[in-house]
């Protein structure tokens, strides 16, 4: 469930090469997302099984020996079960969790596809054929900037637009796209488009 910054990046560039052969990196958004709960921001992490430091992302298996699906879905229901649009969108996400894809890349691709469908967005996304060690001339490696340990304000991709959230009195920026979808429904796309940083 990518962050709002990730989606702002997709919208900003319109055409994106998604690295399908990179090496899996720990502590990135590749296996985590941030949602807003009654107790504040909660980071949901998909546990993975990887045997080497340079394991290709498409070979990274999800570790179902841990009860993460129950925890994730329980946290999502607790956070958004009473949100205005949960009844419309919740089942789309629940189906993916119930399918239990074997590989992290497949889980991420399914969740991204659902989010784009619900947002009615159609950026051009092509999967790379091989690991791209360098960025070609005229291109930007913008998606690599989207990282939980990097301050999004320095990336010039995402400019937060305040919207009504389920909890708290202060707006929390750059959460998972699920927060925006569940809280704003059809308005999510408009808010997201206004969140794109314009150079």
Residues of each region from the PLM?
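Residues lining hydrophobic/aromatic ligand-binding pockets adjacent to catalytic sites
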Residues: 1-199
């Amino acid at each position: 469930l990518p962050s709002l910054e990730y989606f702002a990046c997709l919208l900003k560039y319109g055409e994106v090469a998604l690295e399908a052969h990179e090496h899996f990196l720990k502590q990135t958004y590749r296996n985590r997302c941030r949602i807003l709960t009654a107790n504040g921001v909660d980071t949901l992490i998909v546990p993975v099984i990887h045997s080497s430091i340079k394991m290709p992302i498409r070979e990274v298996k999800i570790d179902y020996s841990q009860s993460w699906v129950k925890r994730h879905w329980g946290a999502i229901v607790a956070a958004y079960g009473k949100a205005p649009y949960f009844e419309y969108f919740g089942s789309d996400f629940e189906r993916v969790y119930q399918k239990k894809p074997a590989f992290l890349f497949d889980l991420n691709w399914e969740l991204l596809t659902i989010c784009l469908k619900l947002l009615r967005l159609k950026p051009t996304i092509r999967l790379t054929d091989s690991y791209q060690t360098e960025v070609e001339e005229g291109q930007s490696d913008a998606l690599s900037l989207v990282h939980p340990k990097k301050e999004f304000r320095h990336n010039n991709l995402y400019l937060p637009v305040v919207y009504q959230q389920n909890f708290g009195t202060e707006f929390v920026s750059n959460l998972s796209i699920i927060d925006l979808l569940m809280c704003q429904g059809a308005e999510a796309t408009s808010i997201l488009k206004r969140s794109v940083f314009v150079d």
